[in-house]
Swiss-Prot record:
Family matches, as Gene3D superfamilies: Ribulose bisphosphate carboxylase, large subunit, C-terminal domain, RuBisCO large subunit, N-terminal domain
Chain residues that bind substrate: 113, 163, 167, 285, 317, 369
Additional remark text: The basic functional RuBisCO is composed of a large chain homodimer in a 'head-to-tail' conformation. In form I RuBisCO this homodimer is arranged in a barrel-like tetramer with the small subunits forming a tetrameric 'cap' on each end of the 'barrel'.
Catalysed conversion reaction: 2 (2R)-3-phosphoglycerate + 2 H(+) = D-ribulose 1,5-bisphosphate + CO2 + H2O; D-ribulose 1,5-bisphosphate + O2 = 2-phosphoglycolate + (2R)-3-phosphoglycerate + 2 H(+)
Name used for this protein in its record: Ribulose bisphosphate carboxylase large chain
Gene from which this protein is expressed: rbcL
Main location (coarse class): plastid
Length: 465
């Protein structure tokens, strides 16, 4: 019937409720808030079109390709329970639309343009189902949970970390000293803060050298393998790799990257280097709240977490759950499972919109960090189980007697909780009792319990402005 110019009606092409999704499709769940007066179907098919092959008008070059093969399809729309004028739109994208092994391209396609679309008041990507065919084009985490435990020779308990504070202003020598004290006291890891890169008061190379010295000294004295997350994030990919190379030359076990500010391309580059050279990779999620904090716009963190597992990282910060609201606990555990497990069943109550099969891609250790201290240890052990890194910054360095006793207190609290759990005690109910008993034979822990006995961080969650 020939080519007819004119503005397109997306509905005819992109709203296909009868479509049977394929195993190779990437499936997306969007939370759509249409502008007043825009029907939900229209918003749904507009999302499908705008994030795949659509353009606003008919173009004659459409005749040179098969839209049916390449278009995204809005295959289901349902109202969000309890919300006015919000809808879940499910969109299926054919795999051909995505470059192999590129998280960058996946996001450019799915969320690149559509979020500014005028017919929508707000748009949030709640979840993605990544098909196994696409997952197998990614290397994923450099090592994963099991290999990390084997490298560190640490089993049957969560790992302990600590972010060195004050994060800016220390000289490299004093920074290294703080690292040594924490590791000597009983922590497994210490950490560069996310914004510790390279400054006039502490250049990266000096920091790397003094931290390596601290690691080796602490290892020699404790007989345990220790690590410090050396932050390799920098202004260019070349400089980042240069820093990772130097870390490898020092023989340290782990480096670190800020994957959102650094970008997925840089992150995947570093992850490949880390696997090739036997370095573990710790990932910080600085900037995530810019993307994931609003309930009705942006992207949920579970999507960023899935993307990180594909791009590559052995640890990633994932919130603490402690002292937060109960509902949030289930949602957090949902994406913690998406990071660690091989196969995760669809479960809307935990925020998991699609069943996800990772086909044996290595898992990522979730890192609980931010405002936690010894009294939280039973809850953290109970909630996260063994496969997690528990990170106490102020909860170590804020100890009245100093860093090493702070580290001792945390290690004693952790070992007490793990032992109590293994003996069949219920940490949810008896947690405080377990900590109190341990205080009797650890003056360091007793002092820590005294300092933090009353501190709580409880606010209602802020997710809409």
């Amino acid at each position: 019937d020939g080519f007819k110019a004119g503005v397109k009606d997306y509905r005819l092409t992109y709203y296909t409720p009868e479509y049977q999704t394929k195993d190779t499709d990437i499936l997306a769940a969007f939370r759509v808030t249409p502008q007043p007066g825009v029907p939900p179907e229209e918003a749904g098919w507009a999302v499908a079109a705008e994030s795949s092959t659509g353009t606003w008008t008919t173009v004659w070059t459409d005749g040179l390709t098969s839209l049916d093969r390449y278009k995204g399809r809005c295959c289901d729309i349902e109202p969000v329970p309890g919300e006015d004028n919000q809808y879940f739109a499910y969109v299926a994208y054919p795999l051909d639309l995505f470059e192999e092994g590129s998280v960058t391209n996946m996001f450019t396609s799915i969320v690149g343009n559509v979020f500014g679309f005028k017919a929508l008041r707000a748009l949030r990507l709640e979840d993605l189902r990544i098909p196994t065919a696409y997952i197998q084009t990614f290397q994923g985490p450099p090592h994963g949970i099991q290999v990390e435990r084997d490298k560190l020779n640490k089993y049957g308990r969560p790992l302990l970390g600590c972010t060195i504070k004050p994060k800016l202003g220390l000289s490299a020598k004093n920074y290294g000293r703080a690292v040594y004290e924490c590791l000597r006291g009983g922590l497994d890891f210490t950490k560069d803060d996310e914004n510790v890169n390279s400054r006039a008061f502490m250049r990266w190379r000096d920091r790397f050298v003094f931290c390596a010295e601290a690691i080796y000294k602490a290892q020699a004295e404790t007989g345990e393998i220790k690590g410090h997350y050396l932050n390799a994030t920098s202004g260019t990919c070349e400089e980042m790799i240069k820093r990772a190379v130097f870390a490898r030359e020092l023989g340290v076990p782990i480096v670190m990257h800020d994957y959102l500010t650094g970008g997925f391309t840089a992150n995947t580059t570093l992850a490949h280097y880390c696997r090739d050279n036997g370095l573990l990779l710790h990932i910080h999620r600085a900037m995530h709240a810019v993307i994931d904090r609003q309930k009705n716009h942006g992207m949920h963190f579970r999507v960023l977490a899935k993307a990180l597992r594909m791009s590559g990282g052995d640890h990633i910060h994932a919130g603490t759950v402690v002292g937060k609201l109960e509902g949030e606990r289930e949602i957090t555990l949902g994406f913690v499972d998406l990071l660690r497990d091989d196969f995760i069943e669809k479960d809307r109550s935990r925020g998991i919109y699609f069943t996800q099969d990772w086909v044996s891609m290595p898992g990522v250790l979730p890192v609980a960090s931010g405002g936690i201290h010894v009294w939280h240890m039973p809850a953290l052990t109970e909630i996260f189980g063994d496969d997690a890194v528990l990170q106490f910054g102020g909860g170590t360095l804020g100890h009245p007697w100093g860093n090493a006793p702070g580290a001792v207190a945390n290690r004693v609290a952790l070992e007490a909780c793990v032992q109590a759990r293994n003996e069949g005690r219920d940490l949810a109910r008896e947690g405080n009792e377990v900590i109190r008993e341990a205080c009797k034979w650890s003056p360091e822990l007793a002092a820590a319990c005294e300092v933090w006995k009353e501190i709580k961080f409880e606010f209602a969650t802020v997710d809409t402005l």
